[in-house]
Amino acid sequence: MEDFLLSNGYQLGKTIGEGTYSKVKEAFSKKHQRKVAIKVIDKMGGPEEFIQRFLPRELQIVRTLDHKNIIQVYEMLESADGKICLVMELAEGGDVFDCVLNGGPLPESRAKALFRQMVEAIRYCHGCGVAHRDLKCENALLQGFNLKLTDFGFAKVLPKSHRELSQTFCGSTAYAAPEVLQGIPHDSKKGDVWSMGVVLYVMLCASLPFDDTDIPKMLWQQQKGVSFPTHLSISADCQDLLKRLLEPDMILRPSIEEVSWHPWLAST
C-alpha cells in the first residue's frame, strides 16, 4: 500500500482514524504540496452488503458534493489488491468529540458558530437529495474556526419523485432517532435532524442527552423529552431549538430548512 501511494505521489504518515473496514492516514501530497488525509478502504475485508451497497453509494456521493463545510475529496485510487484510497482534505483540529472530551462543554457562542456550519452543510446535502445517516461528533471535524462534515459511508441518495421512507438502521445508537431504533419506516432527512440535536447537546453539555447503554430505557427517555443540566445556564432559545431537534414524533420534528430559520441561529 505504501509503495502504491508513493508511486501516485503520496508519502504516508501516521494513522489518524479507524473505521470497521477502513483506516484514515495522514499523508503528504507532492502534487498539491500539502498534507492530506487518505481513507484506505479494504474491499476484500468487508461483508457483501458493504461492498455491494454502502461502498458504491459512498463513492458516488463524495464525487458530487462540493461545500465549504464538507471535507473535499481530491482523488480516488484503487490498488491491484482491492484497496480503494480516497485522498481528502485534512482537518488538523481533530473532531468535535475530542474537543469536548478534552475541553469540556463549549461556550454557547462557540457551539452556535459551529452548529450553524453543520446546518449549512446538511441543508446543502438535503438540497442535493442526500441524507448523511451517520451524523455524530466524531464525523464533525475542525479546521480552525470551521466545521467540516466527513464520512458518508452510510449516506443515501433519496428519490426526487416522492418522499423516501427507509427501514434501515444506520449510524450510531447514541445519535439515532427513536423511529430508526424501532425500525419504523422513516424519513432519513428527519433522522439527520435528530442526530444534529444530539451533536448540539453534546457540544453544550459534554454528555449525551439519553442513556445509550440500555435501548428500552433510552426509548422511554426520548419519549419523555430532553432535560438540561441546570448548572450550565443554556439560553431559553437554545433549549427551545434542542427540544425541537429532539422531538420524538418525526412528523412534528422540523426540516433542515425550518431549523435554519430558528431564532437561536439567527441571533448573534
UniProtKB/Swiss-Prot annotation:
Residues 10-265 form the Protein kinase domain. Its EC number is 2.7.11.1. InterPro entries: Kinase-like_dom_sf, Prot_kinase_dom, Protein_kinase_ATP_BS, TSSK3_STKc. It catalyses: L-seryl-[protein] + ATP = O-phospho-L-seryl-[protein] + ADP + H(+); L-threonyl-[protein] + ATP = O-phospho-L-threonyl-[protein] + ADP + H(+). Autophosphorylated at Ser-166. Phosphorylation at Thr-168 by PDPK1 activates the serine/threonine protein kinase activity. GO terms for cellular component: sperm flagellum. Keywords: ATP-binding, Cell projection, Cilium, Developmental protein, Differentiation, Flagellum, Kinase, Magnesium, Metal-binding, Nucleotide-binding, Phosphoprotein, Serine/threonine-protein kinase, Spermatogenesis, Transferase. It holds the Pfam family Pkinase. The lineage of its organism: Eukaryota, Metazoa, Chordata, Craniata, Vertebrata. GO terms for biological process: protein phosphorylation; spermatid development; spermatogenesis. GO terms for molecular function: ATP binding; magnesium ion binding; manganese ion binding; protein serine kinase activity; protein serine/threonine kinase activity. This is Testis-specific serine/threonine-protein kinase 3. Its cofactor is Mg(2+); Mn(2+). Can use both Mg(2+) and Mn(2+) as cofactor, with a preference for Mn(2+) in vitro. The gene is TSSK3. The modification Phosphoserine is found at S166. The active site is at D134 (proton acceptor).
